[in-house]
Amino acid sequence: MNAEFALKGQETKASLVNVMSDVARPNWLLKLLPSSKGQEQAPVEKLYYDVLEASRQPVFYLEYEVADTFDGRFDMLCLMMSLMMARLKKADSENKEFAQDLFDAMFRDVDLTLREMGAGDLGVGKRVKKMSEAFLGRLTAYDKGLVEGNASILAAAIARNVYRREEEADIDLRLAEQCLRLFARLEDVADADLYAGAPIFSQLVRTA
């Protein structure tokens, strides 16, 4: 996958702060995303929030031992976003503009999250740029394993980018195999449902 995405200077309501700012709280796994009832959201925002919720599922932090930290949660968001981006690439219409909009939604949220967490205006832009570059690197690293259905390739990328180490371990392969199962189920989701922002992905993770 060519990482042909660029940041845009737009603003939107943040919800990532609710994922990232409570990492020290003992009940973070039980905390739900804020309700958006009564607020009209664009389909791409709905899809982003669904990917975000998928990345928060307890199974990743308990069974797969992803670090319960800001970095760990961001790494899982990058992994789940990579699955969604790879799925969108396979859509019949291959709506590249929609994929760009999804990327924008993610990093508008990252920007506002960092501000909510107290980062100064001067530092936010640099951190957002660094995080967007990190995501694009992961997007490329994960794509080969996802597209080829190769758990070993995907596991090597997960070891480096989720567990932050060069040596591989059994848990890398377990998480890679889980991601491939999720990706296979995503392929069965209708393109129209994805473009409508249907909350399907997080449900797939919960029932996997």
Regions found by a protein language model. Name each.
Residues 2-79, 83-208:
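Surface/interface-facing alpha-helical segments and adjacent flexible terminal/loop regions used
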